[in-house]
Amino acid sequence: MMKRKFIFLLFALCAMIVSAQNTKYVNMFMGSSGDNGQLAPGATVPFGVICVCPDSDPNTHAGYNYETTKVTGISINRLSGVGCSGGGGNIRIRPLHPSKELHINKKTERAVPGYYATAFTNGIQTKLTATNQMAVEKYLYPKEIPAALWIDFSSCFEADATYEYSQAAPTILEGFIHAKTVCGRGMYKLYFSLNTDKPFKLKEIDGEQPCLDFGNDVRKVEVRIAVSALSTDVARKECARWNKYSFNRLKKNSYKEWKELLATVDVKGGTDDDKAIFYTSLYRACLSPVDVTSADGRYLGTDGKVYRADGFRYYSNWSLWDTFRTKFPLLILLKPGQMRDIATSLLHLYRTGKKDWATLDESTPTVRTEHAVILLLDAYRKGITDLDFNIGYAGMKEEMERLLMRKPDQKMEAACDLWAMAQISEIMGKKEDAILYKERAERLFEETWKKEFMNIDASYEIMKGNGLYQGTRWQYRWAAPQFLDKMIEWVGKDTLCAQLSYFFDNHLYNQGNEPDIHVPYIFNRLGAPEKTQQLVRNLMTEPMIHKYGGNAEFKKPYFGKAFKNHPIGYSPEMDEDDGTMSAWYAFGALGFYPMLVGDEHYELTSPLFDKIVLRLENGNKLTIQTVDRVQKDMPIRSVTFNGSKVENFRISHNELIKGGKLIFNY
């Protein structure tokens, strides 16, 4: 018996050691160069409000640009891989007078999950870490440079913020900033408490940024900036919570959070680059939404009122037009407890006031909230059944009446929302509503698809043709997999499969934007699973021809990989979009994908790795394994789950989370 216990403990210890190594694969600089992802290597915790990082000059949407050494300073927040001018970039600190240039010494730059450090070419060093709502910044000065910090309270990636501040103590500044969200579609207000470990003299000169002067004898300064959407008092208390924790302790805590999160998935096989892209993708998928709940359990509603979060944590910072497709399905799989809180937050968002983009009373920078009903249905279908839809049902109904339907793509997306709303109504026992929304969805799809997308002609290849948003008619043709059976009925299965083959053979697919990223998996449903397997593998690992960027057709097609373990981590103009593209890659690597969000089934494809182990939150373990695969592009012969054959290359989420072995035979 003792021998058995020893062996068990030994295996458990080995598993912990292997999992602890997963963080080493995260490439914090992947996708941080130019317009190839729009990402940053900032210090943050999972789903943290703070992401503290240098801002490049000129900057990108996330503030940081790997290929640029010149920086304007270090700001406390940013969104990951989003469009327009990005979001955040607030409370920017500069450890050198603004009249003098500040350049990163690239040889000294280092970043791991939860920590960033670099030296500047003038000898000043900075080290950065974070808690959920507090940036921690350490500055080390050479003897010849006096310790001083210049603060730009107006800094914001979207437009200058308005602000107020005052000195509350010899080591404390407090106030607020009021800034625009992404694309200028809304506003957020952050109260802050800025604390230093040494007293400073506040210098305020007209036309210049306020300066914190620490005197000639100080060589090290630590700054802590806590924020809250509620009040300076809450921000002050948030800062005080961590008084007993040193910089190194906070750094270790942040790293530990990431280590534990990434330990939920272990892989064997594949190349080091495969592992780096995979674990970096898991990391990127867990940056948002962010937990804005105060320590005493309160949050700011989008109606400007303060509420108590009873029995859940309140999340903000949305980019749902992108992320409902992949990121949230991934979180439902890996973090269902957290997804319950995220879904509950969305229901309360409907209650307090939800716009398609943002309100004037946001808690953080945010982007878009369309298709929340599909996300909520997906969570419910995949086992998060203790959601109180009554909280947001009135708001959902109101949203269904104002869905945009001016353009063909809007009509296709509206049909998908109505489809989801019909099912939520059915779940709630509202039969009449369910029938109404189902009929509206089916009628709208039929009218739109038959008129705009059924009869193919040369205009289908034109980006933004017929007013489409960031896509072509070819790409939006497949945008509503909810109605795939109707497409098959109207066109014929063989014809539709041939048209889909033409779509890919002629490079009309766009991996660089969201409307068609599910389309490789449609081959599964058309009886050609080997094409899904080949396409997904090639898109993940091989150089391919890419004709389209985010908003236009390239003058010359780009030939290369869409995903690379490199600062130029994505194809040109491919925004990572707040975890969307990362989650797309992660699902492909796992060997299954949520082609139809709102349905519990996954489409199977060939896993990237030879063996994958998922430690599910319910305590079960799912092992995914390949058998007799001697070449990476071999087609799958059959799939079994716990010994039973899986039919049609589809499997349900609710079966997978029971745990067991998913075996791919070649």
Report each predicted region and the residues it spans:
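Long, well-ordered, tryptophan-enriched scaffold segments
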Residues: 448-457, 462-464
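Accessory carbohydrate-recognition regions in carbohydrate-active enzymes
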Residues: 21-328, 332-374, 381-404, 408-412, ...
